[in-house]
Curated annotation (Swiss-Prot):
Transmembrane stretches, start-end: none
Glycosylation sites: 23, 228, 262, 402
Keyword Electron transport: no
InterPro entries attached to this UniProt entry: PAI-2, Serpin_CS, Serpin_dom, Serpin_fam, Serpin_sf, Serpin_sf_1, Serpin_sf_2
GO biological process, one term: negative regulation of apoptotic process
Residues annotated as site: Reactive bond: 381-382
A Pfam family assignment: Serpin
SUPFAM superfamilies: Serpins
PTM summary: The signal sequence is not cleaved.
Major localization listed first in the record, in broad terms: cytoplasm
Protein name: Plasminogen activator inhibitor 2 type A
Originating organism: Rattus norvegicus
Gene that encodes the chain: Serpinb2
Assembly and interaction partners: Interacts with PSMB1.
Gene Ontology CC, one term: extracellular space
Amino acid sequence: MEELSMANTMFALNLLKQIEQSNSTQNIFISPWSISSTLAIVFLGAQANTEEQMAKVLNFDKIGSYDLTPGNPENFHGCDFAQHIQRDNYPVAILQAQARDKIHSAFSSLSSTINTPRLGDYLLESANKLFGEKSARFKEEYIQRCKKYYSTEPEAVDFLECANEARKKINSWVKTQTKGEIPNLLPEGSVDEDTKMVLVNTIYFKGRWKTPFQKRLNGLYPFRVNLNESKPVQMMYLREKLNIGYIKDLKTQILELPYIGNISMFLLLPDEIEDSSTGLEMLEREINFDNFNKWISKETLDEDDVLVYIPKFKLAQNYELKPILQRMGMEDAFNKGKADFSGMSESNDLFLSEVFHQATVDVNEEGTVAAGGTGAVMTGRTGHGGPQFVADHPFLFFIMNNITRTILFVGRFSSP
């Protein structure tokens, strides 16, 4: 499970970089955990080069014995050498099956930990499903493995003859699964008679802060979008003992805001806007697996009495991930002539048409949906001897499960 968390973190940061490149100044909110766990359902039926590309993009090739490239005996010693020799005697098919099983078993365990919080801690509403053209006919073995590892099964729809009705059916299913939060995920024209397979992934997060923000200090305050523009936004205020740190090389503060239930939001805020866009260019360029783990560790963070001001906001972002995943290296899965999903269907023309993703979050005083209300313009920024965290310009944020160290959500707030 630890290896899978590492793989998911790598995927999350790589995905963020790709989305940042195509949306240099816009708000971003995605659930890389939800995306990777849904793509794993497709990976379950992928074969040959399609499987290899997906494994690299999702970083599944970093898990256990998935990389089946023969090793050099000089690199093995003692028990490792004996295990390697013994492993070389196994048929490749058995090794591959064991490696795949380890990935999907880890997802099952990780999903159980993340998706079943203690009563009242937080809420994750998600809808994840693979919809395929009914003529493809999914293999019974694939259906059973989907049920075993992911508690779901693919659904056959009639894209060929009734594409728009299939779209409405998918939207209706998503609306029901998310209790009305996401009523129209697939827009008109998003599927047609050539559509073979669509992956739907939506997630909605509601959490409660461990220490709620002060409502009485809500009010309008200028949020600097860039060097030349500001927009009014409601700000929230909190004074509390929190983990806070400073990344000197990037002139960036990092703050941990805990939710109830082993979930935290980590915010990364540059001191000032020092580029021509959001002020986040250098920070976004330097984010990688090693740096991120260092930034959120005790090596960087210390508890202090912190004065916090952050905007009150709600983000509901829609993405069609096909071009992004293709740029990351997952090409064959979307290619009619190259895709190999023979593990899920006997049909040789099955390919992934699109991956639709929507993630929604509310950030407010309670940490969940709160009643409206206005108050005084933000005050009280002086007379405090401890550190201040004033998010009145663009910042990045990560919502993480602290037990599994899994990044559930990644966001960039650049404009109200």
